[in-house]
C-alpha cells in the first residue's frame, strides 16, 4: 500500500510513514540529476513519494525512512523475505525464556569506513536506541529497565524486565536498533544530517544527502553479506506524484514505490515497466483522542464512525486495492503465526460502527453537541488516497450537521502532530515493518498510543500478549484488547491495504514478497547491463 508508517511517539520528528502533489514539474529533485543517475551504468534511482529530514531513522520512523535504512544500516537481527527473523550483525542468537536474550556478534562485521564492529560499538548503539532523547521516534520499542552487557568475547546478553516473545523484532533495523560506530556518532554535530551523514554496517555508505531533494549511497565494499549488483543507490524525493510518473516514463528513475491508486494503471502503461502489487500489512482508520472536546463524548465518536462508508471508499477510491477493515490488525500481520484465515475469523466478530447515517444522526442527537460542530481532519500531501477518503467522510458528516474541514499538510508536519493532542480526530496510517503479530496493536493499544487512550484492562492485555508463548493465546489477547477499544470507538478501522511498486526494465527484484523493502533489498535486485 502507498501509505506510510507513522512513528510510535508523539515526540517524534516528521515522516511516515506506510504509514507517503500536482504540477508537472518536480518539487524535488531538480536540475536533471535523476536523469543522469538512472542513465549512469551501475546506478539505481529510486523515486520516493515524500522526503526525509534526516538519515537517522531513530529520529524519523516513516516507512520511506525504513526503506532507505535497509541499504545502510543493520541491527543485531534482520527480516527475511518470508518475514522471519534472520541473522545480521549477530550471527546467531537464542533465548530460553523470552526474557534473557543472548547474541553472538559476527566477528567479520565492519563499518563502512573499514573499522571493525566492536562490542563497545554494539552496546553504545543499544544505549542510543533506548534513550528517548537520542531516539525520540523509536525508543518506545525498548522496555524500561532493559539491560545489555558483554557476556563473552564476541557475545552480548540483553535482559528484559519481563518476558517478551516479540523482542527479536526490536533489535532489527525494521524496529528500534541501527548499529553505528561510537567514535563517528560522538564526533557528529548532528548525526544523520546532510553535514554529518550516517555510519552503519550495511552494503551501501551514505555519500551525500540533501533534505527534500535526494540521498545518495555508494557500495561500501565492507558488507559481510558480500557483493551487491548496483554501485550506487540514489533516492530522489518527490512531493509531486505527476512529476514522479513523468520521471518513471522518461527513464530518469528506475523504481517508484507506494504508487497512488489512481496512477497504477498509468505506470502499467509505460513500456518496459512492471508494476508489482502486494499486501503491505497496513492499517488505515480514524483515531479519536478522548482528551480533546467534544471527542470525549462517545456519542460524538460513534456519530462520526457511523458516517464512514468503508465499502465505498475501498471499492471506489481505492479501486478494490484494499480490504474493508474490521479491526486494527491486518489479518496477514495478526496471522503471521496462526495463519491469515484464522486471524480473519478471530476479528470477524469485533464491534464496528457500520455505515448508517440515521444511526449517526441519532448518536449526535444524544451527544453534548446535538446541533453539530466543526472539526478538522488533516492528511499528508504525499498520501493523496487519504485526502480522497477524508473528503468522502466530510461529505457524509455534512449531512448530519458536522462541518469537517479537510486539510493537506507536508508529511513531516502531519506526523509531528500525531498523538500530540492537537486534534481530537485524526487519521492513522500504519504500515507494519516486522512480522510481529502484535505490532500494530502493540502501539495503538499500548501505553504510548497515539489516541492517548488509557484503559488498564486493554493495556494489561497488550502486556500479557507479549509474554504469551502460545501463538493462539497471544492472538486471543490482542483481539480482546481490540474488542474493548472498538466498543468504545477509540479507533474506527477503515481499510487494510496493499502497495504497488513500479520497476523499470533495468531492474528486476528477486523473490518479491510483502516484506521485500523491509529486507536488505538492494542485494536482491538484478541490474541489466
Region spans (language model):
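N-terminal lobe/hinge region of extracytoplasmic solute-binding protein
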Residues: 47-96, 127, 199-200
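Gly/Pro-rich hinge or "lid" segments in bacterial periplasmic/extracellular proteins
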Residues: 84, 173-227, 232
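Structural transition elements
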Residues: 323-363, 384-386
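Detector for C-terminal structural segments
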Residues: 19, 210, 308-337, 385-394, ...
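Ligand-site clamp/hinge motif
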Residues: 216, 220-266, 403
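Surface-exposed binding/hinge segments that line
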Residues: 94, 104, 139-184
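Alpha-helical secondary-structure segments
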Residues: 118-125, 155-159, 202-203, 230-232, ...
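Ligand/substrate-recognition segments at binding pockets and active sites
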Residues: 361-432
Amino acid at each position: 500500500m502507498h501509505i506510510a508508517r507513522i512513528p510510535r511517539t508523539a515526540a517524534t520528528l516528521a515522516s511516515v510513514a506506510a504509514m507517503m502533489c500536482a504540477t508537472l514539474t518536480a518539487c524535488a529533485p531538480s536540475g536533471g540529476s535523476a536523469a543522469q543517475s538512472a542513465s549512469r551504468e551501475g546506478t539505481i534511482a529510486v523515486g520516493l513519494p515524500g522526503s526525509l529530514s534526516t538519515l537517522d531513522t531513530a529520529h524519523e520512523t516513516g516507512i520511506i525512512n525504513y526503506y532507505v535504512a535497509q541499504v545502510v544500516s543493520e541491527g543485531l537481527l534482520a527480516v527475511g523475505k518470508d518475514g522471519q527473523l534472520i541473522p545480521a550483525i549477530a550471527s546467531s542468537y537464542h533465548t530460553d525464556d523470552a526474557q534473557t536474550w543472548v547474541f553472538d556478534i559476527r566477528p567479520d562485521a565492519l563499518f563502512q569506513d573499514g573499522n571493525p564492529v566492536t562490542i563497545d560499538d554494539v552496546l553504545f548503539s543499544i544505549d542510543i536506541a533506548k534513550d528517548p532523547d537520542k531516539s525520540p521516534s523509536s525508543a518506545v520499542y525498548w522496555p524500561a529497565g532493559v539491560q545489555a552487557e558483554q557476556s563473552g568475547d564476541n557475545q552480548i546478553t540483553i535482559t528484559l524486565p519481563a518476558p517478551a516473545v516479540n523482542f527479536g523484532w526490536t533489535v532489527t533495523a525494521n524496529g528500534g536498533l541501527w548499529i553505528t560506530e561510537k567514535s563517528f556518532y560522538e564526533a557528529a554535530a548532528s548525526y544523520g544530517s546532510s553535514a554529518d551523514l550516517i555510519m552503519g554496517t550495511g552494503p551501501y555508505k551514505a555519500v551525500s544527502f540533501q533534505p527534500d531533494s535526494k540521498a545518495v549511497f555508494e557500495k561500501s565494499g565492507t558488507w559481510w553479506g558480500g557483493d551487491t549488483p548496483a554501485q550506487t543507490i540514489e533516492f530522489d524525493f518527490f512531493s509531486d506524484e505527476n512529476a514522479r510518473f513523468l520521471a518513471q516514463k522518461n527513464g530518469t528513475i528506475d523504481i517508484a514505490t507506494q504508487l497512488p491508486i489512481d496512477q497504477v494503471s498509468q505506470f502499467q502503461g509505460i513500456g518496459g515497466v512492471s508494476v508489482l502489487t502486494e499486501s503491505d500489512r497496513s492499517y488505515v482508520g480514524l483515531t479519536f483522542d478522548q482528551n480533546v472536546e467534544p471527542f470525549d463524548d462517545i456519542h460524538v465518536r460513534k456519530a462520526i464512525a457511523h458516517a464512514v462508508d468503508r465499502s465505498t471508499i475501498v471499492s471506489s477510491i481505492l479501486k478494490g486495492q484494499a480490504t474493508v477493515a474490521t479491526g486494527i490488525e491486518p489479518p496477514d500481520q495478526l496471522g503471521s503465526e496462526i495463519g491469515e484465515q484464522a486471524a480473519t475469523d478471530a476479528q470477524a466478530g469485533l464491534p464496528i460502527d457500520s455505515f448508517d447515517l440515521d444511526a449517526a444522526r441519532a448518536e449526535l442527537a444524544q451527544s453534548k453537541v446535538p446541533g453539530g460542530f466543526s472539526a478538522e481532519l488533516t492528511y499528508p500531501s504525499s498520501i493523496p488516497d487519504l485526502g480522497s477518503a477524508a473528503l468522502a467522510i466530510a461529505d457524509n458528516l455534512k449531512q448530519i450537521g458536522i462541518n469537517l474541514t479537510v486539510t493537506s499538510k507536508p508529511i513531516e508536519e502531519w506526523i509531528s502532530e500525531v498523538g500530540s493532542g492537537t486534534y481530537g480526530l485524526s487519521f492513522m496510517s500504519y504500515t507494519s515493518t516486522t512480522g510481529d503479530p502484535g505490532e500494530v496493536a502493540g502501539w495503538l493499544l499500548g501505553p504510548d498510543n497515539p489516541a492517548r487512550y488509557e484503559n488498564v484492562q486493554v493495556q494489561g492485555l497488550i502486556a500479557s500478549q507479549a509474554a504469551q508463548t502460545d501463538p493462539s493465546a497471544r492472538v486471543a489477547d490482542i483481539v480482546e484488547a481490540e474488542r474493548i477499544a472498538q466498543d468504545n470507538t477509540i479507533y474506527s478501522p477503515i481499510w487494510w491495504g496493499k502497495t504497488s511498486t513500479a520497476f523499470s526494465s533495468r531492474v528486476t527484484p528477486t523473490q518479491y514478497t510483502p516484506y521485500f523493502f523491509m529486507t536488505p533489498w538492494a542485494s536482491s535486485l538484478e541490474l541489466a547491463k
